Amino acid sequence: MTHQTHSYHMVNPSPWPLTGALSALLMTSGLIMWFHFNSMLLLTLGLSTNILTMYQWWRDIIRESTFQGHHTPTVQKGLRYGMILFIVSEVLFFTGFFWAFYHSSLAPTPELGGCWPPTGIRPLNPLEVPLLNTSVLLASGVSITWAHHSLMEGNRKHMLQALFITIALGLYFTLLQASEYYEAPFTISDGIYGSTFFVATGFHGLHVIIGSTFLIVCFLRQVKFHFTSNHHFGFERAAWYWHFVDVVWLFLYVSIYWWGS
């Protein structure tokens, strides 16, 4: 093995990007199969492959960063820019959903009855479950900031407590969203209103699940003393992602639940 004289991480070839891409293909194809043919076989296979990929990819990253010391300040700087670009791409992703919503709602076509919400659609009350969901996510934003400050101050106990509260609030939000979907008086097939509502809020819900998974991994890593007050890159990126999810929900609440109703 040659001696490394630079601060960059020369990553070994990894199969996980390929298996991750294949699992994404299986999940999206499986979602179509579930919607149109009521078969969850492909979707279950895709989810299983995705969970296995996440586990093994996280295992490799933890080994490289925590135990082998490959995440030098130079590498962290590059990863930080990468995370910023990823969040920007997610902003553009949700911009498409908001564009579809406002395009349809600001000038409703005669087929919709010339009004918004369309004739026959009974929208959800924004002051009931959606307002509770807003409170839950805002509280989780406060608790993850508490966790971050506790970690920087070296207070491990408070960091674990705050992170546990954040995870619990994230899971509670997901349960509330699932119950709202179950009790909604309209479906995804109820025209443009149902489509924009369920796709926009559903993709946000998916991001909450991804963020919660990220935070659970950070919690387990903190239990095993992987983070220090100076080196906690993984947790910091998870906190960024969680704040992004918070902000997107505020736009969803104001646009779709409050103004759109």
Curated annotation (Swiss-Prot):
* Membrane topology label: Multi-pass membrane protein
Gene Ontology CC entries for this record: mitochondrial inner membrane; respiratory chain complex IV
| Transmembrane annotation, as ranges | 16-34, 41-66, 73-105, 129-152, 156-183, 191-223, 233-256
Q: Topological domains (Mitochondrial intermembrane): residue ranges?
A: 35-40, 106-128, 184-190, 257-261
Tell me the Gene Ontology biological-process terms attached to this UniProt entry.
mitochondrial electron transport, cytochrome c to oxygen; respiratory chain complex IV assembly
What does this gene product do?
A: Component of the cytochrome c oxidase, the last enzyme in the mitochondrial electron transport chain which drives oxidative phosphorylation. The respiratory chain contains 3 multisubunit complexes succinate dehydrogenase (complex II, CII), ubiquinol-cytochrome c oxidoreductase (cytochrome b-c1 complex, complex III, CIII) and cytochrome c oxidase (complex IV, CIV), that cooperate to transfer electrons derived from NADH and succinate to molecular oxygen, creating an electrochemical gradient over the inner membrane that drives transmembrane transport and the ATP synthase.
The protein's name = Cytochrome c oxidase subunit 3
